[in-house]
A protein has these predicted regions:
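Membrane-interacting alpha-helical segments
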Residues: 1-7
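Long, structured ligand/cofactor-binding scaffold of large enzymes
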Residues: 8-11, 15-144
Length: 144
């Protein structure tokens, strides 16, 4: 699932209320990073003032997007966890192993051949566990 409008609507419908609770507990304005992190706490009962480097916090992300260069290890760890599917919408984007040299066409062809084993693994694991797979040339996960 690449774009889930209902998920976005639900998140923003509850956003102001969640931020209000956080401000009430912390008694101060919040940075953008704090707003993002506190609205993604795994359990609302965890709401407290956290100390950097001291406290451990569990989060529940809305989605997971992985790039090809690091998704390999993440997916191996996921497989070892013994889960049947991802808990949140997840995607693998094959864009980081493509080296820009001669142009889009030749560079994608070279990357596809050079990284065939990696791409095959990522595609197969993604298919097995219901994870979206964006093949080389399908787009980039973020802007340079």
């Amino acid at each position: 699932m690449v774009y889930d409008l209902d998920m976005l609507k639900a998140f923003y419908a509850s956003f102001e209320k969640k931020i209000g609770r956080v401000r009430a507990v912390l008694q101060r304005p919040l940075t953008l990073a704090e707003k993002i992190l506190y609205t993604h706490l795994y359990d609302d009962a965890q709401l407290k003032n956290y100390e950097r480097g001291e406290d451990y916090v569990n989060f529940r992300p809305d989605r997971v997007a992985m790039q090809d260069a690091t998704a390999q290890m993440a997916l191996l760890q996921f497989i070892n966890a013994g889960k049947d599917s991802a808990a949140v919408p997840s995607t693998v984007h094959c864009d980081h192993l493509i080296q820009a040299y001669k142009g889009a066409g030749p560079d994608i062809a070279t990357a596809t051949e050079t990284n065939r084993e990696v791409y095959d693994f990522l595609r197969d694991v993604s298919s097995r566990f219901g994870i979206g797979f964006w093949k080389p040339g399908a787009g980039i996960i973020h802007q340079v």
